[in-house]
Amino acid sequence: MCGRCCRDLRVPLGLSEALDWLRDGGEVQLLCEAIPWLVEPAADDLAAAYKFRRSFAALSGTLPLRVVVTVVAAFEGPCPHLQPDLACGIYERRPRVCRIYPAEINPFIELRPAGKACPPDAWSDRHPVLEASNRYMEPSLVAGIDAFRDADVGDVGAKLVLCAVLGVSSTALANEGFVAVLVEREAMMRAIGTAIDRAEAIEGNACAESWTVVSNRRRSREALASVDARAVAPEALPAQQKYLGFHASSDD
């Protein structure tokens, strides 16, 4: 047993997995990031197509965005399901991301052992080959990754509804950070259930309006304002929302 990768995490979940996590007493957060989407990318731009499929359209002022909402199980210290013997207490129904670790969900992120919490022995030659020529070798692993990606895309409409139900309309810029949405457990459970129920009524080209982009960098806010987007500093976020920045605050 190891358990090194089961601590201090935000684990991406599908919406159905999030409901299970909440029913078990865990905490679920939303992480919101946005990509300015001024023009449609070329048909052969596979990275852009991947971002498009897992996001919904929105406007900040007159600036078109694609908003990516990641639903995560959040915990500090050991996972609430990590047992004293380091076994998983929900092993048979653990989230998909736990099942595929240390593989990457994003097809455009390279697997780097140095960036994983696995002990060095996990990468030794005595274990089956995990990856070769940028392809994962184990069929069940590939199936798990595909299942997560399918759920991620399938949940997009419900995530748009979920943000509306929770009154969420703030997002960070992609590559700058996230706006984390921190809602009490029962309220989050009700909101996700409502979002799933209403998702079928959402049209594929639905656009969420009046979003605000949050940045802790003045230059980013000024650049956004110059293209008629609504941009604010993290201090303007409402209660139950928190800015998680990748960079130090900057006023220059």
Give short role names for the model-derived ranges.
Residues 1-252:
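Short loop/turn segments that flank or connect secondary-structure elements
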